[in-house]
């Protein structure tokens, strides 16, 4: 009886949180395959440079013709013109897309406001031209919904209390799994006993 009570209570109390975690897991894992195409049909999503290019295979990376130093210098100048106050906090190069990304944040603040991440400026790895930007909590309603997926999934959108809630939700999922199996085994045993001839 206690297994059934735990299973039912946790399932009822946390179904909303469990739904959010499940939905955001789907959106993060199947972003380019399902989530982005569906969102683009429902509402206006501003494409990033990664959404407008086809990635190369792992065997055929795009080698950059621009150096990190050159791209970071361009990004600093562009960020100053845009009124960014944070310094360059990091940079990366995606060899599958031929794109540099430069992030702007203070040390230790790489998750930005509400966990949505810092602003990024993107540049072409071949000729260094500016390709676009990603600004946290800016854009269309669909852009903001897309940006909110990781903060919702990780609980960062609510700060430390949200992260604690998501951690506890993981324990609840484990409890639901265990109690679900125990309930199933008891029902199965009862069915088997009923079928046995007297």
Can you say where each PLM-predicted feature lies in the sequence?
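Conserved histidines in hydrophobic membrane contexts and catalytic metal-binding motifs
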Residues: 1-198
């Amino acid at each position: 009886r206690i297994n059934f009570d735990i299973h039912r209570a946790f399932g009822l109390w946390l179904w909303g949180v469990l739904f959010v975690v499940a939905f955001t897991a789907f959106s993060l894992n199947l972003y380019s395959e399902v989530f982005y195409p569906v969102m683009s049909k429902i509402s206006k999503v501003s494409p990033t440079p990664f959404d407008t290019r086809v990635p190369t295979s792992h065997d055929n990376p795009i080698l950059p013709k621009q150096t990190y130093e050159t791209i970071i210098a361009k990004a600093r100048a562009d960020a100053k013109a845009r009124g960014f106050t944070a310094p360059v906090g990091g940079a990366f190069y995606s060899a599958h897309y031929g794109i540099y990304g430069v992030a702007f944040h203070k040390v230790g603040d790489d998750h930005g406001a509400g966990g949505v991440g810092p602003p990024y400026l993107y540049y072409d790895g071949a000729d260094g031209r500016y390709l676009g930007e990603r600004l946290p909590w800016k854009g269309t309603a669909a852009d903001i919904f897309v940006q909110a997926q990781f903060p919702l999934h990780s609980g960062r959108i609510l700060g430390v209390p949200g992260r604690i809630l998501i951690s506890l939700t993981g324990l609840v999922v484990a409890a639901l799994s265990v109690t679900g199996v125990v309930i199933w085994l008891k029902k199965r045993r009862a069915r088997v006993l009923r079928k046995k001839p007297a």
